[in-house]
Amino acid sequence: MRSGLEWNEDYVDGSVSDVIEMLASPDMAALAAAKPLEHEPGTHFYYSSGTTNIIARILGDHLGGRDAMEAALQDQLFRPAGMTNSIPKFDQAGTFVGSSFVYAPVRDFLAFGELFRNGGMAGEQRVLSQAWVDASVREHSIDDESGQGYGLQWWLARDEFGSFCCNGYEGQRIQVVPPLGLTFVRVGKTEADYSDDLRAFYNQVAQAFA
């Protein structure tokens, strides 16, 4: 999220939004990568779905393209983690839309959170290294607007429990609360104006298990 590329992540009706344009593009990573450089790379944090899809393109190209990327997701992550009904979606250029498009039931999203709560283990099987999990949920940046910390594709919740979370559109969320042995998922739809109320709600959920 510190690529330095110009980007507008707003989803508000009537705004000039790069993310809306990107999601309608046949080649999402190319659109994001073509944006002008606004800051020196590594110096400025700004949440960008475009950056996520650039990363997905780089990884997909390294693995050998669309089919290889899908096989890696299913064979090395989804199925070992217990995400047996998850479907990754790709754009017309063959890039996994990592920012936005994994179709999955709540159980599978829960399994993803549990994988990180358990340090990369799914039952007795190691799926991700402990080092990767630790790096993912360690603060690397701070979002100036919200004050939240950001790791590697994970947000840090800034609560008393040291929770970390995946934040989706309009309140979708996977929240992991390691000290309480708790992972929970929300798939509701709430407008951004109520984001402070949502954060209070998530904290109340955790408090109920404390």
What are these regions (language model features)?
Residues 38-47, 96-103, 166-167, 191:
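Solvent-exposed loop and edge beta-strand segments that line ligand/cofactor-binding
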Residues 5-6, 52, 93-96, 116, ...:
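Solvent-exposed loop/turn segments at secondary-structure junctions
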Residues 1-82, 106-110, 114-115:
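Active-site-adjacent helix/loop patches that line small-molecule binding or acyl-intermediate pockets
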Residues 168-210:
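Structured C-terminal helix/loop/strand segments within mature extracytoplasmic catalytic/sensor domains
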Residues 72-137:
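Active-site-proximal binding-pocket segments
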Residues 26, 83-90, 133-183:
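Active-site Gly/Thr loop motif
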Residues 51-59, 100-121, 172-188:
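Active-site-proximal alpha-helical segments within enzyme catalytic domains
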